[in-house]
């Protein structure tokens, strides 16, 4: 069947993938029902896609998922859409290893048999830009069908690039040329872009502008034409365990906590969980629930506000269900962040550092039954944080880290029977026990 799809891949990081991919999604959304995707484990870029398309963007990751799972997850979310735009990660071929493509944009493109549009930084380049494209085309068996030249300087620069392409690569479509433009910049910080909940109105306005600029400089009809290819469907691929058990889950979601995979919520709902969102910043108490789920984010930027909300802190302390905290959520339920008092459910504190403390795909094994898995089972995830825990008096950890760092001594997931919290970020496919364990733990 036809399932229109295209990967927007870069020759490297910092070539404009997120801005241009999001702009393409926004521009196409005027005529089409668009599904966005991000290659890799990033939380923030998909929230930009979601604003652009009105559909929840998803992650596709060949470390988290095998080829069939990538195809099935894509099929699940794209089957009722007109076209899918998949934003790559880093350079097209960058993955976790120097000698294979696991974790790379190329691996996802190959799993989906998707055409690729290559985004090239053309600053001060003409013939050399063509050499780069030819190298990318010959390196592996991927389908590079078009190119976008970013950071072009002048009409003369554009003419030279056109001449070089027509001479050396006449069969590759030129999708367009984007000039050096301050409007194509996006604000970032240590964990990536600024999350959309922090400055929603301004980011929405930027995305509208990116869509207008893409319409001006790129050939959208060529993008749709390139995307128009057959897709080989797959049937009944295992994504995650389903062991239905009705539970109410309160999920922290606001400016401080917004790092979530929407597929985790899908997996929880398939296991009959009912999800209700609340704000540790603005609300006075946790909703009526069986489980409290506090995901990642930037609590360090809002630590004073979080600390001032004494009613919420007391509500969390008095919560009589199970609590799961992930990275930023872990930090929040320690005694303090940079000496600013927090919830204090865990006997340790969090401090921010100037250097990354964990940046890795993770392989782990459960040491005991807990809120997100069962003893002896292995799972995957990722970690990315600049904080670390100090004055750790906790001695019980739910999982050992086989690849990655964890909290201390290759251990992660502080666990006291009621509270589980760690630095490892879970995706429901990479940890297929996540949702079923959460709704069934303790029974």
UniProtKB/Swiss-Prot annotation:
Cite the CDD domains for this sequence: CobB_N, GATase1_CobB
Catalytic center at which residues? 327 (nucleophile)
E.C. number, please? 6.3.5.11, 6.3.5.12
GO molecular function annotation: ATP binding; cobyrinic acid a,c-diamide synthase activity
**Record-annotated site: Increases nucleophilicity of active site Cys:** 425
Question: One biological process GO term for this chain?
Answer: cobalamin biosynthetic process
Which enzyme type, at the first EC level? ligase
Keyword ATP-binding applies: yes
Keywords associated with the record: ATP-binding, Cobalamin biosynthesis, Glutamine amidotransferase, Ligase, Magnesium, Methanogenesis, Nucleotide-binding
Q: Which PROSITE patterns does this chain map to? A: GATASE_COBBQ (PS51274)
Q: In this protein, which residues make up the domain named GATase cobBQ-type?
A: 248-433
Domain remarks: Comprises of two domains. The C-terminal domain contains the binding site for glutamine and catalyzes the hydrolysis of this substrate to glutamate and ammonia. The N-terminal domain is anticipated to bind ATP, and cobyrinate or Ni-sirohydrochlorin, and catalyzes the ultimate synthesis of the diamide product. The ammonia produced via the glutaminase domain is probably translocated to the adjacent domain via a molecular tunnel, where it reacts with an activated intermediate.
Q: What else is known?
A: The a and c carboxylates of cobyrinate and Ni-sirohydrochlorin are activated for nucleophilic attack via formation of a phosphorylated intermediate by ATP. CbiA catalyzes first the amidation of the c-carboxylate, and then that of the a-carboxylate.
Question: Know the name of this protein?
Answer: Cobyrinate a,c-diamide synthase
Species: Methanocaldococcus jannaschii (strain ATCC 43067 / DSM 2661 / JAL-1 / JCM 10045 / NBRC 100440)
């Amino acid at each position: 069947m036809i399932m229109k799809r295209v990967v927007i891949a870069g020759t490297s990081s910092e070539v404009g993938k997120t801005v241009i991919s999001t702009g393409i999604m926004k521009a196409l959304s005027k005529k089409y029902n668009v599904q966005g995707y991000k290659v890799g484990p990033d939380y923030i870029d998909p929230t930009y896609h979601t604003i652009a398309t009105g559909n929840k963007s998803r992650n596709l990751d060949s470390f988290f998922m095998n080829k069939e799972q990538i195809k099935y997850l894509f099929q699940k979310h794209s089957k009722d859409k007109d076209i899918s735009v998949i934003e790559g990660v880093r350079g097209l071929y960058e993955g976790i290893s120097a000698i294979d493509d696991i974790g790379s944009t190329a691996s996802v493109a190959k799993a989906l048999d998707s055409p690729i549009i290559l985004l090239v930084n053309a600053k001060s380049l003409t013939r050399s830009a063509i050499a780069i494209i030819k190298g990318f085309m010959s390196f592996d068996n991927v389908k590079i069908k078009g190119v976008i030249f970013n950071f072009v300087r002048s009409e003369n620069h554009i003419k030279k690039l056109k001449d070089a392409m027509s001479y050396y690569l006449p069969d590759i479509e030129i999708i367009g040329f984007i000039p050096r433009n301050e409007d194509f910049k996006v604000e970032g910080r240590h964990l990536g872009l600024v999350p959309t909940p922090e400055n929603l109105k301004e980011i929405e306005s930027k995305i509208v502008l990116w869509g207008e600029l893409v319409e001006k400089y790129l050939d959208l009809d060529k993008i749709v034409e390139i995307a128009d290819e057959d897709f080989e469907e797959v049937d009944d691929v295992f994504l995650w365990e389903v062991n239905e058990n009705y539970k109410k889950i309160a999920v922290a979601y606001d400016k401080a906590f917004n790092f979530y995979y929407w597929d985790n919520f899908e997996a929880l709902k398939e296991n009959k969980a009912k999800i209700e969102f609340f704000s540790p910043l603005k609300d006075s108490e946790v909703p009526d629930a069986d489980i409290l789920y506090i995901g990642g984010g930037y609590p360090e930027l809002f630590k004073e506000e979080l600390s001032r909300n004494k009613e919420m802190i007391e509500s969390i302390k008095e919560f009589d269900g199970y609590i799961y905290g992930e990275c930023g959520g872990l930090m929040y339920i320690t005694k303090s962040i940079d000496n600013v008092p927090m919830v204090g459910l865990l006997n340790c504190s969090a401090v921010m550092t100037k250097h990354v403390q964990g940046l890795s795909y993770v392989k782990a094994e459960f040491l005991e039954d807990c809120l997100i898995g069962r003893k002896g089972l292995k799972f995957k995830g990722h970690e990315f944080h600049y904080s670390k825990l100090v004055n750790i008096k906790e001695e019980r950890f739910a999982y050992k880290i086989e690849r990655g760092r964890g909290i201390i001594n290759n251990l992660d997931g502080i666990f006291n029977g009621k509270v589980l919290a760690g630095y490892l970020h879970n995706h429901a496919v990479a940890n297929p026990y996540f949702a079923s364990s959460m709704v069934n733990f303790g029974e």
